[in-house]
């Protein structure tokens, strides 16, 4: 437990980093879908690597379109820094791998299992396993970002995490981060990608030096640079991409498959086209790193590559984690673990390459953003577009981080300050994360260490979520977030960032705003990673956490000068939050997220508070540096904001689904300054619209794939990311949906892109939806969901006939949470397709309409509702597209809510479980119920909403929707009901175990406190007696007179003394009882 504190710190830091990383990773992933996970890594690592790459890559712009976003997100402006980064990155990478090798492995294994769901594990296992282990560690660090995802596993993870994580993890994490970044850079450079492992290693030393000596600054820079670099890359887009792709995937897009295999890059690869380079490099290096880290450990096999997705995941994780900081390495690992978990689901879901990617993203996020990575990966999987989404996912993952973050928080809490706030309090974790971020910011030490800083970014990205996962930054990212962010988590943010950054570059100032937001995102995710970045927004919780973190981080960073990084971290966090953040996961949304975060805040006050602050900070002080970032990121933010925001938000949302909504809300508000994104914000709305566009944009989607895709994907991921949190994965799964997701991203992108350009717009549009959907989805099945989602998606997609598809989906959902998600996604996809028009439209049209408003409302509402709404909203779009899906989506949404509620984590988990069941039920309504359980009132409302899926604010619409849902449900209800019951039982058990765990921890804390008080009391009594003995009669008489007179000294003291013990006792008994 004690370790946990450190772990926590590490985790938080990791999360932060994770989240940030996530965010970045997300970016990267965005850059390269395939890179998704790698991307995530890239984001952080690549950020470093990428940046350098970016510079190098710039020339090859064409290929790099996606990367540009990453670059953009990173920081278009700083190519030079990137170069520096490069060195750094490489050094880092190398270092990372090294440190990670042993540590990470451990982490992976420990956490992975717990975190990862069996399915996830299997999916991610090949790569995941290594990663998983990492992830687990990461989770631990992150706050059991992943754990959260797997409700049951969470506990284990927590435990394992506490144990596993410990300081070492953190250290390794940090190292990993360093390595990771280093590696990433090389990857980014591209040459290394294939070699990633070796080159990185060799570089390691050099880079390390840089890192150590320069790293710090570099890192800081790094972050900035990365962001900037990314920006550049992004802006250059192509070059970056190419470089990245090349690096990562030597092959480049073509290589993608291979690359994918090769290293995380592989995942990246798939995504590669999107932003493989970045991603790849990221993944590549990161993968390498991961691999190195992990591979060195066991990871090699993971090779992250092994499962492309997984690989990526690993990478991502590493990124988030690695980035996080060397220490974080362990953390990272933890993050990774988380990621893995998430990823696993993603992996599971993604198992397809796409999935894998998804997974990667998640991982990123989870890492805290590892998770995010996974998400991104997932996105990737779906296709390039998916890849992009993947990137987003990454962000998301931050979210998982975020989600994870939530849980993580609990865990973290116990570890670091268990008694401070209920374990269950997400805030706690985030706060921790925040602290961490602060630390991070402060960490500057660490951050300074390149790793740290990057991590921060990563974290932001992550917390995810990651995570953001992570948590704060990565918190879970998720570190936890990531994270989750931030988890939870980052990628999305990153992606968004990338895009946004691109945009940013284009519209830096606006971007600035956006960035700020975004940064917030990242920050959030980072912290989360996940995380705060909400990504990692990984926190995801992490993100959210991250967000919080971010805020703090922001502060810190701002104060420290880390600011920039912090910003990034923040961004990451934000992303993450969106992520990681989360979750992310949540942070990501940062941009939007920021707003989101605010929103987030709403949903997750804790986070959100942090987030908002972050937001403010971003805008305010950070702006300066943050602005830098901000600018860079801003764009991202902006972009993010738009779609991403959503995503980001989602990330955070993912962190908290709410975030998403929030994001959206925020978005809607235009909040983020992002306003540009505003639209983004609108995103939600826009998304909706876009979503609507989706249908229109179906093409967009396809288009997306190419460049757009990346972006969209990125965004989708973001969206996904946002979702991620819990569902990040799901999201990702959806991402698999990705197409849809991508679309969503697109949608999101559009805002950003729109800013950037029409195409993106179109792309963006759809993505937005998807994103949202994803979000919904994400939440719903955090890990599983994703997988399911993916599966589902296919079906859904296949099923296009929404109605049927929907039901199937519903059923599918029953079978798998994912499915629900899937369906959602699928709905998305479908919706994207015709569904939107068709089914949705018919039944849903109104709903959509409602949705939209609801969206806003929901958003406002709350996060939960907002989320719901958002989800729904988007779903609405989707919903529109598909009634059922909508419903499902909503459920997802609900799920999100739940996640958001987090309810907390537990609720979320339970909900997830339920969700799994419920979703199946189409029972969105049920899901909602489940959600409601988790969410409680909101949830319920949501549920209703869900039911009313159509109406996001379903509450109002409920009647309408419900019927819809109900009707649809009925067909699948028989089995669904049973499945749901089972799920509910499982969820209850899970909750029970979690509660027991939490209670035990609290009791322990209280016992210790009581002990301390008793000791103190006895000591005071002894002192009193001694004083009495020593005192002269005159003095005593005086004293007595004073007492009688009412002099407080003695009297008060004794009373005070007595009271404390009494209180403790009562406390003890209370808790004990």
Curated annotation (Swiss-Prot):
Tissue specificity annotation: Ubiquitously expressed in adult tissues. Expressed in the postmitotic epithelial compartment at the top of intestinal mucosal villi.
Ranges of Low complexity composition bias in the record: 36-45, 84-100, 272-288, 465-483, 1044-1073
Residue ranges, annotated region (Required for interaction with TGFBR1 and promotion of TGF-beta signaling): 1-98
Biased composition (Pro residues): 58-70, 614-625
Region feature (Leucine-zipper): 1006-1027
Record keyword Membrane present: yes
Phosphoserine, modified sites: 263
Transmembrane region(s): none
Xref: InterPro entries: TSC22/Bun (IPR000580), TSC22/BUN_CS (IPR047862)
Gene3D superfamilies, alphabetized: Single helix bin
Pfam family, one: TSC22
Keywords: Cell membrane, Cytoplasm, Membrane, Mitochondrion, Nucleus, Phosphoprotein, Repressor, Transcription, Transcription regulation
Subcellular locations according to the entry: Cytoplasm; Nucleus; Cell membrane
Record text on subunit structure and interactions: Forms homodimers. Forms heterodimers. Component of a complex composed of TSC22D1 (via N-terminus), TGFBR1 and TGFBR2; the interaction between TSC22D1 and TGFBR1 is inhibited by SMAD7 and promoted by TGFB1. Interacts with SMAD7; the interaction requires TGF-beta and the interaction is inhibited by TGFBR1. Interacts with TPT1/fortilin; interaction results in the destabilization of TSC22D1 protein and prevents TSC22D1-mediated apoptosis. Interacts with SMAD4 (via N-terminus). Interacts with ACVRL1/ALK1, ACVR1/ALK2, BMPR1A/ALK3, ACVR1B/ALK4, BMPR1B/ALK6, ACVR2A/ACTRII, and BMPR2.
Protein name as annotated: TSC22 domain family protein 1
Source organism of the structure: Homo sapiens (Human)
Taxonomic lineage: Eukaryota, Metazoa, Chordata, Craniata, Vertebrata
Encoding gene per record: TSC22D1
């Amino acid at each position: 437990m004690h370790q946990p504190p450190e772990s926590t710190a590490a985790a938080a830091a990791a999360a932060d980093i994770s989240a940030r990383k996530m965010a970045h990773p997300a970016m990267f992933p965005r850059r390269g879908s395939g890179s998704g996970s790698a991307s995530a890594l890239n984001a952080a690592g690549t950020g470093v690597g990428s940046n350098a790459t970016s510079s190098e890559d710039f020339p090859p712009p064409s290929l790099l379109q996606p990367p540009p976003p990453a670059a953009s997100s990173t920081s278009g402006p700083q190519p030079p820094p990137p170069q520096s980064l490069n060195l750094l990155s490489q050094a880092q990478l190398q270092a990372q791998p090294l440190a990670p090798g042993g540590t990470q492995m451990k982490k992976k294994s420990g956490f992975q299992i717990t975190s990862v769901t069996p399915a996830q594990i299997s999916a991610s296992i090949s790569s995941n396993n290594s990663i998983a282990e990492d992830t687990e560690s990461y989770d631990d660090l992150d706050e059991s970002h992943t754990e959260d995802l797997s409700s049951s596993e969470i506990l284990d993870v927590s435990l394992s995490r506490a144990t596993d994580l410990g300081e070492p993890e953190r250290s390794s994490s940090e190292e990993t981060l360093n390595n990771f970044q280093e590696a990433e850079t090389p990857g980014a450079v591209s040459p290394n990608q294939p070699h990633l492992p070796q080159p990185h290693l060799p570089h390691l030393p050099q880079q390390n030096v840089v890192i150590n000596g320069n790293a710090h600054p570099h890192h800081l820079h790094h972050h900035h640079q990365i962001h900037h670099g990314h920006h550049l890359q992004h802006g250059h887009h192509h070059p970056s991409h190419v470089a990245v792709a090349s690096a990562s995937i030597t092959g480049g897009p073509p290589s993608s498959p291979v690359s994918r295999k090769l290293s995380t890059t592989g995942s990246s690869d798939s995504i590669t086209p999107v932003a493989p380079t970045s991603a790849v490099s990221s993944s590549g290096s990161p993968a390498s790193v991961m691999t190195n880290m992990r591979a060195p450990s066991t990871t090699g096999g993971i090779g992250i590559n092994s499962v492309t997705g997984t690989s990526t995941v690993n990478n991502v994780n590493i990124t988030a984690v690695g980035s996080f900081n060397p220490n974080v390495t362990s953390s990272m690992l933890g993050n990774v673990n988380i990621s893995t978990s998430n990823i696993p689901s993603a992996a599971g879901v993604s198992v397809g390459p796409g999935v894998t990617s998804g997974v990667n993203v998640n991982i990123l996020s989870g890492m805290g953003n590892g998770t995010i990575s996974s998400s991104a990966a997932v996105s990737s999987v779906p296709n390039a577009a998916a890849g992009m989404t993947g990137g987003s996912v990454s962000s998301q993952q931050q979210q998982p981080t975020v989600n994870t973050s939530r849980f993580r928080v609990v865990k973290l809490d116990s570890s670091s300050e268990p008694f401070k706030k209920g374990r269950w309090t997400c805030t706690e974790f985030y706060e921790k994360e925040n602290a961490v971020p602060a630390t991070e910011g402060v960490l500057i030490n660490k951050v300074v260490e390149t790793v740290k800083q990057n991590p921060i970014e990563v974290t932001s990205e992550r917390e995810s979520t990651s995570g953001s996962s992570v948590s704060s930054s990565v918190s879970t990212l998720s570190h936890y977030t990531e994270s989750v962010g931030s988890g939870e988590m980052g990628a999305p943010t990153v992606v968004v960032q990338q895009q946004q950054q691109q945009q940013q570059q284009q519209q830096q100032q606006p971007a600035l705003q956006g960035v700020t937001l975004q940064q917030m995102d990242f920050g959030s995710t980072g912290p989360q990673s996940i995380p705060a970045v909400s990504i990692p927004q990984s926190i995801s919780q992490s993100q959210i956490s991250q967000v919080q973190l971010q805020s703090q981080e922001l502060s810190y960073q701002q104060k420290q000068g880390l600011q920039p990084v912090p910003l990034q971290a923040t961004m990451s966090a934000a992303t993450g939050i969106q992520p990681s953040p989360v979750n992310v996961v949540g942070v990501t949304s940062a941009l939007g997220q920021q707003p989101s975060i605010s929103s987030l805040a709403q949903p997750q006050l804790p986070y959100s508070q942090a987030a908002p602050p972050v937001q403010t900070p971003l805008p305010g002080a950070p702006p300066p540096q943050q602005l830098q970032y901000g600018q860079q990121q801003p764009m991202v933010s902006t972009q993010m904001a738009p779609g991403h925001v959503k995503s980001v938000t989602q990330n955070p949302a993912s962190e908290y689904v709410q975030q998403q909504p929030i994001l959206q809300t925020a978005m809607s508000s235009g909040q983020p300054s992002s306003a540009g994104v505003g639209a983004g914000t609108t995103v939600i709305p826009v998304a909706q619209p876009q979503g609507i566009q989706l249908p229109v944009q179906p093409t967009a989607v396809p288009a997306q794939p190419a460049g757009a895709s990346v972006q969209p994907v990125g965004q989708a991921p973001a969206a996904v990311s946002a979702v991620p949190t819990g569902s990040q994965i799901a999201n990702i799964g959806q991402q698999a949906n990705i197409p849809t997701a991508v679309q969503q991203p697109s949608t999101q992108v559009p805002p950003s892109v729109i800013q950037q350009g029409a195409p993106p717009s179109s792309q963006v549009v759809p993505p937005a939806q998807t994103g949202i959907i994803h979000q919904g989805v994400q939440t719903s099945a955090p890990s599983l969901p994703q997988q399911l989602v993916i599966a589902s998606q296919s079906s859904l997609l296949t099923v296009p006939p929404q109605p049927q598809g929907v039901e199937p989906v519903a059923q599918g959902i029953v079978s798998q949470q994912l499915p629900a998600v899937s369906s959602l996604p699928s709905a998305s996809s479908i919706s994207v397709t015709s569904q939107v028009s068709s089914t949705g439209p018919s039944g849903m049209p109104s709903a959509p309409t409602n949705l939209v408003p609801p969206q806003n409302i929901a958003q406002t509402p709350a996060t939960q509702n907002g989320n719901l709404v958002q989800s729904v909203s988007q779903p609405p779009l989707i919903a529109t597209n598909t009634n059922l899906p909508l419903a499902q989506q909503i459920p997802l949404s609900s799920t999100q809510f739940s996640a958001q509620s987090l309810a907390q984590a537990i609720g979320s988990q339970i909900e997830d479980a339920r969700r799994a069941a419920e979703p199946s039920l189409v029972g969105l309504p049920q899901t909602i119920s489940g959600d409601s359980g988790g969410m409680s009132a909101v949830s319920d409302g949501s549920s209703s909403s869900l039911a009313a899926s159509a109406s996001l604010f379903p509450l109002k619409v409920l009647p309408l929707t419900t019927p819809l849902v109900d009707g649809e449900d009925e067909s699948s209800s028989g089995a669904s009901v049973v499945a749901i019951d089972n799920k509910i039982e499982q969820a209850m058990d899970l909750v029970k175990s979690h509660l027991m765990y939490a209670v035990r921890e609290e009791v322990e804390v209280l016992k210790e406190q009581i002990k301390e008080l008793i000791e103190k009391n006895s000591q005071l009594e002894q002192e009193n007696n001694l004083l009495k003995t020593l005192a002269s009669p005159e003095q005593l008489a005086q004293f007595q007179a004073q007492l009688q007179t009412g002099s407080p000294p003695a009297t008060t003291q004794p009373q005070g003394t007595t009271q404390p013990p009494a209180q403790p006792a009562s406390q003890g008994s209370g808790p004990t009882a």
